[in-house]
Curated annotation (Swiss-Prot):
Keyword annotations from UniProtKB, A to Z: Cytoplasm, GTP-binding, Nucleotide-binding, Protein biosynthesis
Disulfide bond residue pairs: none
Cell compartments where the protein resides: Cytoplasm
Protein name, UniProt field: Peptide chain release factor 3
Keyword flag Ligase: no
Source organism: Photorhabdus laumondii subsp. laumondii (strain DSM 15139 / CIP 105565 / TT01) (Photorhabdus luminescens subsp. laumondii)
Coiled coil regions, renumbered to chain: none
Pfam families recorded: EF-G_D2, GTP_EFTU, RF3_C
Family the entry assigns: Belongs to the TRAFAC class translation factor GTPase superfamily. Classic translation factor GTPase family. PrfC subfamily.
GO cellular component terms, semicolon-separated: cytosol
Claim: Protein biosynthesis is one of the keywords in the record: yes
Binding site for GTP: 20-27, 88-92, 142-145
Length: 529
């Protein structure tokens, strides 16, 4: 295979997202990753609001003026010989289906765990999503500068709860006030921790070898001996690193450190660029597309709307799968069978929203969207194919939506269907009545929908509680059995925005009983876009 400039560009791309429970330290680790990638000169700390440190890195702060906060969505930075694309997954309040779908656009994930707490609920959910594509996972056990749980116990919990084998790459020496550093099992080096160096890249002292007298002198004989004994146990009880198992999502390399103290993040980044895959092939409804192909293909995984009614622009995020994007090129939008000239795609380099001239597989570009682009749309240079694996997820929160002005029913329905195509929310129309039920994954989605209905469709809507706790898409290969099911379960059936049959259950117990009663019916948690 000739190593053309194009192939070199593809080979150096690494595209990943960070998954964590709120407060496990995702914002801090994002900052430190950017610091090591020299994307920002100095990281602010989230704690030091009163000090001269900014609450976050400056450009993140600028994003707070509620325009399209696009720069925090995709950040590109160089690290060693690679070019890394970090896709942000929104945190607490902004948690939505976007968070899930972003994970379908990456080739690898970094799971950040608060080592004082272990595996938490949001992490479990996000890991379930990575399982849809067996995404490779690296793990960073964070907050070693605080008192943490036993490291072996933490790894056991990850293995048991998330069903993935753990392979420690670094191992902590103490924690909290007595945190001394980490030992790298594969380089046979100990790195010593210094406090108070969180916002700059520090020179870390490395001591080669476990039996080096320097180690005893640096951390004390007792701790050094304890470390040797611990490592004997660890090496006996844990998995060896196996690159193939990692690439198949079966094994996760585990790193220990403190993002706030800026320690251990670089070991994880070294592992990421060394082991994470370059842009991967993607399945379509016709064939598999390799990143090395010279014709451009890509898919839309997220649409970001503007909260400012003065600017209606929305940006559609496109993951480049193959070929090269060049400014002004003509692309074929497969779903609507139309050619479009893309003159002003956006890129996201270290926090600047700027126009892009070139993009390669693994890169994310932003397309201006005036309502013609939907999630799951495929763009090609003419070939008629559609990328698969961009799912809708069953919502977990439901509200009935009501109009202040009943004469605007038509506009309401139109608005909701369009917003559901964009992925802002899901809409369900029960077969048994004229209600409109809105479903979301994150609570903020409801507020966004009401605001956008008002500003874009001139519809004033309000919510009421509704007796729905979960929804599943319904499939059955036997038309007769499906008809019988529809007849008997009409009270619990609805059509979603794309007219797909959906079972809306008042309780999980109801759903489980219905499943048992109708074993031939498939109740699905995800549905292809």
């Amino acid at each position: 295979m000739s190593n053309s400039p194009f192939q070199q560009e593809v080979a150096k791309r690494r595209t990943f997202a960070i998954i964590s429970h709120p407060d496990a330290g995702k914002t801090t680790i994002t900052e430190k990753v950017l610091l090591f990638g020299q994307a920002i000169q100095k990281a602010g700390t989230v704690k030091g609001r009163g000090s001269n440190q900014h609450a976050k890195s400056d450009w993140m702060e600028m994003e707070k003026q509620r325009g399209i906060s696009i720069t925090t969505s995709v950040m590109q930075f160089p690290y060693q010989d690679c070019l890394v694309n970090l896709l942000d997954t929104p945190g607490h309040e902004d948690f939505s289906e976007d968070t899930y779908r972003t994970l379908t656009a990456v080739d690898c994930c970094l799971m950040v765990i608060d080592a004082a707490k272990g595996v938490e609920e949001r992490t479990r959910k996000l890991m379930e999503v990575t399982r849809l594509r067996d995404t490779p996972i690296l793990t960073f056990m964070n907050k070693l500068d605080r008192d943490i749980r036993d490291p072996m116990e933490l790894m056991d919990e990850v293995e048991n709860e998330l069903n993935i084998a753990c392979c420690p790459i670094t191992w902590p020496i103490g924690c909290g006030k007595s945190f001394k550093g980490v030992y790298h099992l594969y380089l046979d080096e100990t790195y010593l921790y210094q406090t108070g160096k969180g916002h700059t890249i520090q020179e870390v002292r490395a001591i080669k070898g476990l039996n080096n007298p320097e180690l005893d002198a640096a951390i004390g004989e007792d701790l050094a001996e304890q470390l040797r004994q611990e490592l004997e146990l660890v090496q006996g009880a844990s998995h060896e690193f196996d690159h193939q198992a990692f690439l198949q999502g079966e094994l996760t390399p585990v790193f220990f450190g403190t993002a706030l103290g800026n320690f251990g993040v670089n070991h994880m980044l070294d592992g990421l660029v060394k082991w994470a895959p370059a842009p991967m092939p993607r399945q379509t409804d016709v064939r598999e597309v390799s990143a090395q192909e010279d014709k451009f293909t890509g898919f839309i995984f997220k649409i970001q709307a503007n909260m400012d009614p003065k600017h209606r622009d929305r940006v559609a995020f496109l993951r480049v799968v193959s070929g090269q994007y060049e400014k002004g090129m003509k692309l074929h939008q497969v779903r609507i069978k139309k050619d479009v000239v893309i003159a002003d795609a956006l890129t996201f380099m270290a926090g600047d929203r700027s126009h892009v001239d070139h993009a390669y597989p693994g890169d994310i570009i932003g397309l201006h969207n005036h309502g013609t682009i939907q999630i799951g749309d495929t763009f090609t240079q003419g070939e008629d194919l559609k990328f698969t694996g961009i799912p809708n997820f069953a919502p977990e929160l439901f509200r009935r939506i009501r109009l202040r002005d009943p004469l605007k029913q038509k506009q309401l329905l139109k608005g909701l269907v369009q917003l559901s195509e964009e992925g802002a929310v899901q809409v369900f129309r029960p077969l048994a009545n004229n209600d409109l039920i809105v479903g979301a994954v994150g609570i903020l989605q409801f507020d966004v929908v009401v605001a956008r209905l008002k500003s874009e469709y001139n519809v004033e809507a309000l919510y009421e509680p509704v007796n729905v706790s979960t929804a599943r898409w319904v499939e059955c290969h036997d038309a007769k059995k499906l008809e019988e099911f529809k007849r008997k379960s009409e009270q619990n059936l609805a059509l979603d925005g794309g007219d797909n049959l959906t079972y809306i259950a008042p309780t999980m117990v109801n759903l489980n009983l219905t499943r048992e009663r109708y074993p031939d019916i498939n109740f699905r948690k995800t549905r292809e876009h």
